[in-house]
Amino acid sequence: MTKKHLDTTLVQAGRSKKYTQGSVNSVIQRASSLVFDTVEEKKNATRNRAKGGLFYGRRGTLTHFSLQEAMCELEGGAGCALFPCGAAAVANTILAFVEQGDHILMTNTAYEPSQDFCTKILSKLGVTTGWFDPLIGEGIAELIQPNTRIVFLESPGSLTMEVHDVPAIVKAVRNKAPEAIVMIDNTWAAGVLFKALEFDIDISIQAATKYLIGHSDGMIGTAVSNARCWDQLRENAYLMGQMVDADTAYMTSRGIRTLGVRLRQHHESSLKVAEWLAQHPLVERVNHPALPGSKGHEFWQRDFTGSSGLFSFVLKKRLNNDELASYLDNFTLFSMAYSWGGFESLILANQPEQIAALRPGGEVDFSGTLIRLHIGLENVDDLIADLAAGFERIV
């Protein structure tokens, strides 16, 4: 059989009979203690405890193994570590590869908690962090130090949505520091719209809380690694006590089955909203990777197979507190909430100085209020009507 379509892989991955045991979905195996019938069975389990066999609940159960196998098939990895949330996935994956005296490079458009982990935790451990512009490309070579151990990407960038020239960055890192680990927060692409490991990235990290679970009712993080990094990542996660419960692992596997159709709708609807916003007289610019003119659009077009529902736009004016309240408090379909990736549409606002505070060594090139949207699965014309009504409140 020729290579399967992504939609088929999403439905089939991790569903072998050893995990489903006669049902359609993988079984939910809740267990701390796993019983051995013989001394020899216990010896074998102990010997193979790092190889995906039943040993102890913290190493995983059939429910976890099913999800991990699916993630490896989807992202092309040698192994997948599971974490209680996306922030834990980022923090523990970084910790697995650094020690006192090391240096890491992180994009200055990374998710705020990822930045905070570097400045507030790693700094105490004697690990220094340098920051780079998301559009740096091959210029990153100039920032690599002899002790640079990790280069951390996030594409698109948080809030302002810049897309990296990943091949240029990775090539520069491999030439200048071949032993350095390249990892990426790949949450926006859900691990499937951008196949990170195919671009010679070592580890693809996700807040699977977002699109994989897909219903805003669970929290989990994943890190899919290549063979070079897998043993070290796996053992560090185990020693740090990182795990998720079987029910959340099951919910993630279940969410994966509909990921393809959901992402297509997110792409279609978000792009239609972005194109409408780009023509609106109150909007200065739209930051949507699939929209021509968005920063790094050419790299999205070359390297990605689609877009998700998260993007932002900048108003021509800065809203004052009263205008912000009038604008945000009265939407019918858009809710104010952190996170994203579920079926519902969300909205948040940030002033330019708030964004600037999240850009170490960088600046913002706009003065109006930035609005971040997550376009859900509602009818797109209804969503546009809701946004249009919002603009009427701030004219």
Kindly give the residue locations of the regions a language model identified.
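Conserved N-terminal alpha-helix of the aminotransferase class I/II PLP-enzyme fold
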Residues: T38-A88, P113-K120
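Short hydrophobic/aromatic beta-strand micro-patches
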Residues: V224, S312-V314, H374-G376
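Conserved PLP-enzyme active-site core in the AAT-like
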Residues: T2, L10-Y19, C80-H280, N287, ...
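C-terminal core of ALDH-fold dehydrogenases
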Residues: K3, L10-V27, E323-P360
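Conserved small-domain helix->loop->beta segment predominantly found in fold-type I
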Residues: L271-T332, M336-G341, I355-D365
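N-terminal "arm"/small-domain region of PLP-dependent enzymes with the aminotransferase-like
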Residues: M1-T61, E69, I371
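PLP-dependent enzyme catalytic core of the Aspartate aminotransferase-like
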Residues: T119-K120, T128, R149, K176, ...
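Glycine-rich beta-alpha junction loops
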Residues: R15-K17, R30-F36, W188-A190, K210, ...
